[in-house]
């Protein structure tokens, strides 16, 4: 079944038409999932489906409940007559002592951050410390040039990027430790030009960090490694605490949003492999952009498939066009709609869901929750082994 995104943008979150479209699509998605993968269904999803089968509230009921006539999204206008961004999409201007210190340290160590390369709107908040006072930066390793060209990403691309710096794992680890952080996110460009896709370099960086500061929690936001199981295993067993890989968008929009070498099923398999190879206690995580032209029903179906893959944490954020050369924004999803996805995600059994217009996959707001989850898991594991 196909739902016109323009139609969904015009109608309200709580309308009968949207409820009808949701119900038809979600029943098809749920029934097919139950038939195809019953052994992989999580307890939370099983309970949710049982309620549906027994005439309980549908997923569309869950999403539309209490929103009344609140809109699902705000239009962006046309190319000739663009509308202004909604007030909730206004980002703070970068500044402050911590921001200046981190920027200087990065230049001194010749390090790259995805914050700058991808023009992240949260750069000012994360580097200055925001409400928590804890400054964070997501370090990008394996250089600043990607072998792929996704339509949403501002990182520069090349078929033959410069070779990785062999000293980078040590330089990155020493720089991060000098900042006194307790939680750090490492990410990288895609390196299809390397025999191991850069997985060995990634693993060395994690291992070096753990050697210098064993108690530091390390999240690795990795590429798909072309679905290579050996590469996934190498990183998953490197000593990290969170294995993250982003599916980026719903299955129907993969070829529109991502490079042709990436696809939904390959990314889903990477997350499944990570869960299989990772030691007990390692969390898996993924992220989805909204506002690319997807429908709410497609988002729900994506959430189900991701949860069935055993993923622990999922984040949702608004897609923002980095430059005019990149894919245009289809709509601005409202904070209320993001909140509904957050509640539905928890209902489905995700251990943590970060969902908001300004949320990004490596956004600092979720680190405190994830850190607490990891520490609690380890305490339980330690007490049970006594």
Swiss-Prot record:
Keywords: 4Fe-4S, Iron, Iron-sulfur, Metal-binding, Mitochondrion, S-adenosyl-L-methionine, Transferase
InterPro entries listed in its UniProt record: Aldolase_TIM (IPR013785), Elp3/MiaA/NifB-like_rSAM (IPR006638), LIAS_N (IPR031691), Lipoyl_synth (IPR003698), Lipoyl_synth_mt (IPR027527), rSAM (IPR007197)
Residues bound to [4Fe-4S] cluster 1: 115, 120, 126, 362
One GO CC annotation: mitochondrion
Pathway(s) this gene product operates in, as recorded in its UniProt entry: Protein modification; protein lipoylation via endogenous pathway; protein N(6)-(lipoyl)lysine from octanoyl-[acyl-carrier-protein]: step 2/2
Similarity comment: Belongs to the radical SAM superfamily. Lipoyl synthase family.
Protein name: Lipoyl synthase, mitochondrial
Taxon lineage: Eukaryota, Viridiplantae, Streptophyta, Embryophyta, Tracheophyta
